[in-house]
Amino acid sequence: MTTKTRSAPAVPMFRRLMVANRGEVAVRIARACDLLGITPVFAVSAADRDAPYTRGRESVCIGAARSPQSYLNMQAIVQAARQRECTALHPGWGFLSENPVFAALCEAHGVTFIGPSPRAMHLMGKKTPAKQAMRAAGLQLIPGSDGILADVDEARAVGGRTGYPVLLKAESGGGGRGMRIARGPDEV
């Protein structure tokens, strides 16, 4: 059995990348950076200064142990990236990874945000407008409602039209929150 490995580009796209996350997320990003010949720089809270993944690596403290003062502090993270001459920033997942304001702040300060553009985040941030945009782009969608349903009767009508089971989703739910499977009209 042969295994194919990807080689790093001769010249990496970015020389230094700010890792704006912690734990396993930071480890995975650093591993990818190493493979690509990019120097990862860890943005860490005071509590994570001596985390195993930072040993022998460059890190910068961005605030107190609590995440609102560190991993959610947009200004501190972008300032740290600029101070450490990072031309790119990887948010990982969670924290600020889906925050269009943060992505725009990175762009405004000349730091490439590794992730969707602020425009894409705004467009895809809510289920109904996202679905409308995808339909307008000619993409095929899973059958369902065309927007927010007014009541249980409307949900049952959609289920009757598309067939059960159906997945009911809260408009502002995210990450699996606010979802429920209804296997028939009596479960709606």
Residue locations for each model-derived region?
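N-terminal beta-alpha lobe that positions the nucleotide/phosphoryl donor
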Residues: 2-188
